[in-house]
UniProtKB/Swiss-Prot annotation:
Location (main, coarse): cytoplasm
UniProt-annotated location(s): Cytoplasm
Pathway given in the UniProt record: Cofactor biosynthesis; thiamine diphosphate biosynthesis
EC number in record: 2.8.1.4
GO molecular function: ATP binding; CCA tRNA nucleotidyltransferase activity; tRNA binding; tRNA-uracil-4 sulfurtransferase activity
Native source organism of the sequence: Streptococcus suis (strain 05ZYH33)
Class of enzymatic activity (EC top level): transferase
Keywords: ATP-binding, Cytoplasm, Nucleotide-binding, RNA-binding, Thiamine biosynthesis, Transferase, tRNA-binding
UniProt name for this protein: Probable tRNA sulfurtransferase
Entry keyword Acetylation: no
Reaction catalysis annotation: [ThiI sulfur-carrier protein]-S-sulfanyl-L-cysteine + a uridine in tRNA + 2 reduced [2Fe-2S]-[ferredoxin] + ATP + H(+) = [ThiI sulfur-carrier protein]-L-cysteine + a 4-thiouridine in tRNA + 2 oxidized [2Fe-2S]-[ferredoxin] + AMP + diphosphate; [ThiS sulfur-carrier protein]-C-terminal Gly-Gly-AMP + S-sulfanyl-L-cysteinyl-[cysteine desulfurase] + AH2 = [ThiS sulfur-carrier protein]-C-terminal-Gly-aminoethanethioate + L-cysteinyl-[cysteine desulfurase] + A + AMP + 2 H(+)
Length: 405
């Protein structure tokens, strides 16, 4: 027998009271987006659970995708069976003979939403249990924590049997906690920060700074690929490319080398905040980890943060590098992040950056530049694209890379 559907149970959504259906609807839409790579799959939700109908799709692939989607507590692959006692007895015996090993205990857990069915739940438990005893004489029943639980559901359309329960990602459905703008550099830390924000239900838009010709099409594709990895946890993500060449050249020309990083980060924060406001996001999210590099001391963070009043969420701020790498490997972003492409934070990185920048000095250097004009031109030049779980056969960045080669 092949699985016909996967039943989904919600996680924290059960505690959301009157708002539960809003959370459930968001989870349903997220699942549809993530599973859009399987055109034969259909998704249906009722108040208590979700149903993913496979319609011939590969169960292992669909299951692997569901494991990543935030908001799912657990799910159970199920067999669709003719709604008759003989068919149910035959199916239960076949499943037990496939999975049973000597010494295992079992129980039947039947429920029916179709009350016109000829047996009630208690009688169905008895009849199906007797069928198992006949086929496997030495099997033992155990009502509490058995090795095998065969769940039988009698619905209006058919009967369904499941015996596996697979743990989901938990958390909250992406988009139920508002929207944030993720500063996505292309390194190891920022995709992990984005993942952790997604887990708490924050919809993210990924904002990436590009400085051609100093940064390459390969660096931009890397950022696209990292964003696509993050779509696995809740569906499509908007990607925002910001032109940053003019600003970096201006900073390099008019400021001391030791302050290049602080000034660069302040411009990035201003632009991110402006884009955030225009696009209706509530917070800024970044991958800063305290003490990891010169721009991530408390003094540097204070100097950089001074340009905005918007809350800045730093999900990895207290983690060390190995902890961040562990998560990056778990979510499959690490190998992409370590690809050797320069990004805006590394191309003009000073040998001895200021770790304790003075705001009055920073403001003095910024007075040499047309800060507002630079920010306005960068924001006016943004390029917005939608990144989906399904990778396009070839996008514009791929074509640029081929042309260069």
């Amino acid at each position: 027998m092949n699985y016909s559907e996967i039943m989904i149970r919600y996680g924290e959504l059960s505690t959301k009271g009157k708002n539960k259906m809003r959370f459930v609807n968001k989870l349903r839409n997220n699942i549809k987006h993530v599973l859009s790579v399987y055109p034969e799959v259909t998704v249906y939700f009722d108040r208590d659970r979700g149903h993913v109908y496979l319609n011939g799709a590969d169960y292992q692939e669909v299951s692997a995708s569901l494991k990543k989607i935030f908001g799912i507590q657990n799910f159970a692959p199920s067999y669709k069976i003719e709604k008759s006692v003989p068919a149910l007895k035959e199916a239960v015996v076949e499943i037990m003979q496939t999975i049973y090993k000597e010494g295992m205990t079992f129980k039947i857990a039947a429920r029916r939403s179709d009350h016109s069915f000829e047996l009630d739940s208690r009688d169905l438990n008895q009849v199906l249990g007797d069928a198992v005893f006949t086929a496997i004489p030495n099997v033992q029943v155990q009502m509490k924590s058995p090795d095998i639980t065969l769940r039988v559901e009698i619905r209006p359309d058919a009967a369904y049997i499941s015996h596996e329960e697979i743990k989901g990602a938990g958390g909250l459905p992406v988009g139920t906690s508002g929207k944030g703008t993720l500063m996505l550099s292309g390194g190891i830390d920022s995709p992990v920060a984005g993942y952790l924000a997604l887990k708490r239900g924050v919809e993210i838009e990924a904002l990436h700074f590009a400085s051609p010709p100093y940064t390459s099409p390969g660096a931009l594709k890397k950022a696209h690929d990292l964003t696509r990895k993050l779509t696995a946890f809740g569906g499509n993500i908007t990607f925002i490319e910001v032109p940053f060449t003019e600003i970096q050249e201006e900073i390099k020309e008019k400021a001391p080398e030791a302050y290049l990083m602080t000034l660069t980060r302040r411009f990035m924060m201003r632009i991110t905040d402006r884009v955030r406001e225009e696009r209706g996001a509530m917070v800024i999210i970044n991958g800063e980890s305290l003490g990891q590099v010169a721009s991530q001391t408390l003094e540097s963070m204070q100097a950089i943060n001074a340009v905005t009043n918007t809350p800045v969420i730093r999900p990895v701020v207290t983690m060390d590098k190995l902890e961040i790498i562990d998560i990056a490997q778990e979510i499959d972003t690490f190998d992409i992040s370590i690809q050797p492409f320069e990004d805006c934070c590394t191309i003009f990185a000073p040998d001895r950056p200021k770790t304790n920048p003075k705001i009055k000095n920073v403001e003095q250097y910024e007075a040499r530049m047309d800060v507002e004009g630079l920010v306005e031109r960068a924001v006016a030049g943004i390029i917005v694209t939608e990144i989906t779980p399904k990778e396009e056969v070839k996008d514009e960045v791929d074509s640029l890379i081929e042309d260069l080669l």
